Regions:
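Structural signature of hydrophobic alpha-helical transmembrane segments
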Residues: 7-21, 74-78, 131-136, 188-202, ...
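Hydrophobic mid-bilayer segments of alpha-helices in multi-pass membrane transport proteins
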Residues: 18-27, 37-56, 79-85, 225, ...
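Membrane-embedded alpha-helical segments and adjacent helix-loop junctions characteristic
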Residues: 65-73, 78-147, 385-471
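Juxtamembrane helix-boundary/capping and inter-helix hinge elements in multi-pass membrane proteins
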Residues: 93-98, 110-111, 144-153, 180-187, ...
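Alpha-helical transmembrane segments of multi-pass membrane proteins
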Residues: 113-125, 151-164, 187-205, 211, ...
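Juxtamembrane and boundary regions of transmembrane helices in multi-pass small-molecule transporters
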Residues: 167, 171-279, 488-550
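Active-site loops and adjacent core secondary-structure elements that bind or stabilize anionic groups
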Residues: 237-333
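Transmembrane helical segments that form the transport core of multi-pass membrane transport proteins
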Residues: 295-446
Length: 550
């Protein structure tokens, strides 16, 4: 068994710089050298293996096994989700159903800003709550590009929108995992996050529209933006504090969709933005002259929406713990990963006591969200009149379309698992933990870093939750506050994690432009994370914000 070493150079800053090499290599390759994503990911993976084996003294076979374990996880369940979401999109697009759906959304409003709120923010939050793990970005990115948004806008905006709901994604999985790894009360953690994120659920819709069309365009529709945000934030606070983490996103998303749709029946902006570039360039008409209508019958519209309604119902069903448990009971295959399972030991101060790391690959082929999406796709295909041979042809074309994306995701997860099991992630985390009185701010950024590295708020909570609790207790801070801050800060890192960026580029048919997407969203990510850090610092030290911590 190998024990992790967090300061192999006996100098925390040298060790931290070494630990940062894999991430810097991959992000620099993407953002500055315009190298294709799958090549950049492989470069990052090679550098991670070198740092782990040479710098952090991880056994070679263990490091390689960790990378293979991550690659397997990248393909299943994450790649499996993306493959089947795009399969459904291709099925609907070939039959002309997506065109009808697109125009029916324009029927609610022809304004691009309002379409963005409905799809990326409200509808996307529903998929985050029901499925998580890349589902919302894949679905909303595909829908936005189908509506005529530019690829960069569709990719970047779907990523920015997928922030506020992330902490309660997949029916509360990040909070449940955080409670498990810290030993803190799950309902207390749920409530604490619910006293941090609702403010950002109000801010993000404004931020989203501002990112698309600027301040002037955002202010012009502020009543609708406020309705979308408030209708999400209020249920988010109430459900998280008085019920638990399970239905926060689903309830808040449905509330936001319904309230915004009803509001748009009685309110119209003075000028309708119909241009796809987010500018008032003549592609706009007065609100009085444009109602956003279409020429399709109600039956045709319902037929076009049916595949996505089936998808919503099945993804929600697949997220219910009891249903998932029942499916796992007849299908789950657990594989103890050779040369890795119980071969690595996490050490203090990252863990309170030495802790042996498991590595069990769960092949939950029936209960996986991607399988639910596949079933929804097949049902929808039959309803649209596809024959089995036609379905198989579309599926093969979808696979060929996504082959490099799947390769990229596998390589990125291989990198992430290599840094996780080698302790490289934890070295970066400890650098944040050594910030003393500023720890509430930098501890929040630690959550942001965790999600940026792992691609998952759940994984970040598992990785750094124990460290947050231990550091908070040593500094005299409330451990519930800092554990919750890890999750709340983490949501802002979701838009820059390489896995999500590849999902977005794939969904918008813009693979190979990941560097441009990263540059587009990076400022938004770090700025929002800093704002969360400021709020957590106020909650730690400044009255009356301290009253929110109990």
């Amino acid at each position: 068994m190998w024990s992790q070493v967090y300061d192999p150079f006996n100098n925390i800053w040298l060790s931290t710089m070494a630990a940062a090499i894999p991430v810097v290599v991959m992000l620099a390759a993407l953002a500055f050298f315009h190298i294709k994503a799958h090549i950049a990911a492989l470069m990052g993976l090679v550098s991670a293996l070198v740092v782990a084996i040479v710098g952090f003294t991880m056994p070679t076979d263990t490091a390689l096994s960790a990378a293979l374990y991550g690659a397997a996880y990248g393909l299943f369940p994450i790649g499996w989700i993306i493959l089947n979401v795009i399969f459904l999109y291709q099925l609907t697009d070939r039959k002309g159903q997506f065109k009808i759906l697109r125009e029916s959304i324009a029927g609610i409003s022809g304004d691009r800003r309002l379409q963005l709120l409905l799809i990326a923010f409200s509808f996307g939050a529903f998929f985050e709550g029901a499925g998580g793990f890349g589902t919302p970005v894949a679905v909303t990115g595909a829908m936005l590009i189908g509506l005529g948004f530019a690829p960069l806008a569709a990719s970047g905006l779907s990523l920015i929108a997928n922030t506020a709901p992330v902490a309660y994604g997949a029916l509360g999985t990040p909070i449940i995992a955080l409670a498990g790894v810290t030993g803190l009360d799950m309902l207390e953690l749920s409530g604490m996050v619910g006293r941090q994120l609702p403010l950002f659920s109000l801010i993000v819709p404004f931020w989203l529209v501002w990112a698309f069309c600027g301040f002037r365009g955002m202010i012009a529709i502020w009543p609708a933006v406020l309705v979308a945000g408030a209708a999400f934030a209020i249920p988010q606070y109430l459900i998280s504090n008085f019920h638990g983490p399970w239905l926060v996103d689903v309830g808040a998303a449905v509330s936001s969709m319904v309230c915004l749709t009803l509001f748009l029946k009685i309110w119209k902006p003075k000028s309708i933005m119909t241009s796809a570039n987010g500018k008032f360039d003549g592609g706009n008409q007065s609100g009085a002259s444009v109602g956003g209508g279409h020429n399709y019958s109600r039956k045709e519209v319902m037929t076009a929406w049916t595949p996505w309604l089936i998808l919503s119902v099945i993804v929600l069903l697949w997220g219910i713990p009891e249903w998932k448990k029942a499916l796992d009971g007849i299908s789950l295959i657990k594989i103890e990963w050779s040369h890795l399972h119980n071969m690595v030991q996490k050490m203090p101060p990252v863990a309170a006591v030495p802790k042996i790391e498991e590595a069990i690959f769960k092949l939950n082929w029936l209960s996986a969200t991607g399988t639910g999406i596949f079933i929804a796709s097949v049902i929808s295909a039959f309803l649209m009149g596809y024959r089995i041979r036609e379905m198989l042809a579309v599926y093969w074309e979808t696979f060929k379309l996504l082959k490099y994306s799947l390769m990229t995701i596998a390589a990125m997860l291989a990198l992430g698992y290599c840094t996780r099991y080698s302790g490289v992630d934890s070295t970066l985390g400890l650098a944040f933990a050594n910030t003393g009185v500023l720890y509430p701010f930098f501890g929040t950024l630690l959550g942001w870093l965790g999600v940026a590295l792992t691609g998952s708020d759940t994984a970040s909570n598992v990785l750094f939750g124990g460290l947050q609790k231990t550091s908070a207790e040593q500094l005299g801070l409330n451990p519930v506050l800092m554990a919750a801050a890890n999750s709340s800060g983490g949501v802002m890192g979701k838009m820059i994690d390489a896995q999500s960026i590849v999902v977005a580029s794939t969904a918008t048919k813009w693979y190979g432009h990941e560097g441009e997407i990263l540059r587009y969203v990076f400022f938004h990510s770090i700025a929002l994370a800093a704002l969360v850090g400021i709020l957590v610092t106020l909650q730690a030290y400044v009255h009356p914000f301290t009253l929110l911590v109990h």
